[in-house]
Amino acid sequence: MPLPIVAIVGQPNVGKSTLFNRIINERVAIVEDRPGVTRDRNYARASWMGHQFSIIDTGGITWEDSTIDEEIRAQAEIAIEEADVIVMLADASQGVTSLDERIAHLLYRADKPVLLAVNKADNPEQRTDIYDFYSLGLGDPIPVSGSHGTGIGDLLDEVVKNFSPDAEKTEEGVISFSVIGRPNVGKSSIVNRLLGEERVIVANEEGTTRDAIDTPFVKDGTKFRVVDTAGIRRRGKVYEKTEKYSVMRAMSAMERSDVAILVLDASTGIREQDKHVAGYAHEAGLGMIIAVNKWDLPKKDSSSGKDFEAVIREEFSYLDYAPIVFVSAKTGKNIDQLPKMVKEVYENKNQRIQSSVLNDLLLEASRLVPAPMVKGKRLRVYYMTQVKTNPPTFVVFCNDPELMHFSYQRFLINQLRENFDFTGTPIKILPRKRK
């Protein structure tokens, strides 16, 4: 099961981003920031009272005619579709506005839990004024102050009450993967070809809140679940072509995935949108496979394949761990290799290395390349241990974490890759001061 998703929506300038940031700072723990549309820092994974969830901050909803306003509204509507719980934020100092009423009517149609939070209720008089917001028909208004932090705990208590009891459970023994990429690269065709070639189709399951089709199947005795981002219903060609729309669709799929297959179009080459989606998947810590589709076209031979692979390695240098496979959804070329590759990446991503073996490697690495001097002070590395899998994460204890330059972390990652099979998975190094 995917993590529950909470969307914060409302008109402009009611304090949505302030509330979002306050939740991140005030809750018990932030699991990790999620990039993507996230250069705007509007997507994070969080927890409250033991409940993990993803939270989305959206732009202010208006019904102006400008292209920017239309795109912002489209993004908010996508977030509403994705969400399990919606928080509508209003402004106590403004009172109930016509925009609030229009947004409330939009949320009536969502057919999912909606909580009404009234921001800037900073004093008793403003808290009394919130009763006007009952007119929106969204239940009891919850007074909050994003700037001061009051009422945030009460709001989050109500949020987690609305999570499905099964929302945070995971299905054992099933490898979930998503097929991601910009529009029209052949994602849906690859999924259809993949499923059409399987001997056993277990069942089709439609996501109850997301309109994305998760399809379980069995291949060579292994249970898989493919998340087809193309199954999310479209909102029209103008939004289908926007970069953020594509990333939002990919984000939803990645929340339900162990591994992502990034599909590139051999006929059009690499676009900026490809890099945006790939960057999100990489920073989210997913296992990665790069599938170059439409390799059935003329003039696609082994020589041009090597050339294209070189371009991929240059453009996606941060994905140097991801295997590349040339496929054709039209002819079926190499499609049957994808489940096998997904399984291998999943296993690599979840392997655990004994500390004694790691420290032997660390000792040998120190002999090969002595720890560097930084500002006249030498880095001293003492020992390494693996603290988690999925993705593999290693803590390296040293005399001063600030002395461990990125280049030395990269060296240690390369040593790990040379000695163990981490194909397809990112590796994280966390320097820590030895106590």
From Swiss-Prot:
GO biological process, one term: ribosome biogenesis
Keyword Nucleotide-binding applies: yes
Start and end residues of each KH-like domain: 351-435
KW Metal-binding (keyword) present: no
Domain of life of the source: Bacteria
Domain EngA-type G: 4-167, 175-350
Gene3D superfamilies in the record: 3.30.300.20, P-loop containing nucleotide triphosphate hydrolases
Binding positions (GTP 2): 181-188, 228-232, 293-296
Residues that hold GTP 1 according to the record: 10-17, 57-61, 119-122
Pfam families: KH_dom-like (PF14714), MMR_HSR1 (PF01926)
Family: Belongs to the TRAFAC class TrmE-Era-EngA-EngB-Septin-like GTPase superfamily. EngA (Der) GTPase family.
Record's function text: GTPase that plays an essential role in the late steps of ribosome biogenesis.
Quaternary structure annotation from Swiss-Prot or TrEMBL: Associates with the 50S ribosomal subunit.
Protein name: GTPase Der
Organism: Lactobacillus delbrueckii subsp. bulgaricus (strain ATCC 11842 / DSM 20081 / BCRC 10696 / JCM 1002 / NBRC 13953 / NCIMB 11778 / NCTC 12712 / WDCM 00102 / Lb 14)
